[in-house]
Amino acid sequence: DKLAKEMDDLNMGYLINLSGSGFGPQSAKDLYFNQSMKNIKENQPERFGLFVNVDFESIDDVNYGETQANIIKDAVAKGAIGLKIYKSLGLRNKDSSGNRIAVDDPRLDPIWDICGKLGVPVLIHSADPFQFWLKKDNKNERWFELKEKPNRYYAESSFIPPFQEIIQEQHNIFKKHPKTTFINAHLGWMANDLE
């Protein structure tokens, strides 16, 4: 009730929890999601929505795509209204061989397909601001952030590919899955370049 009152004070009608599954092993994600959904349904379901999240750590499992699609199906049946993909996909997530999992990795296709079939959107956050790949100097508008958080500087990374490669991987899934609604978080990091 306190949160709903604060929302009223802000003239906010609806709030979506994008991290509806939380983090950790799948059993913990399932528990967190179920508790969150129960809380919403028992309180103010007309004011709150929940997105589900998927696991990339098990991508090498034989039935990975089917398993994740079933998790999404189950979550939507329970009331999830979308899928949130964190920026770690394409940046930091690795398969069991230590290889970067690309945003357009075909093992992920069942995830995008089921969201299209179920009619739920995929809010996908790919890469980071492109300035994190530029030279750290007075012409980089994020120089201070990079000074304060040097782990965000990717230009010299041997693991993280160039910004444009990650964004292209994202655009590849948009093209490959036309029946799926994708929401490109942060305008694909190009809000200041709308050409």
Question: Which residues fall in each region the model found?
Answer:
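Mid-domain alpha/beta scaffold segments of enzyme catalytic cores
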Residues: 1-118
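Catalytic pocket-lining loop regions of alpha/beta-barrel enzymes
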Residues: 101-195
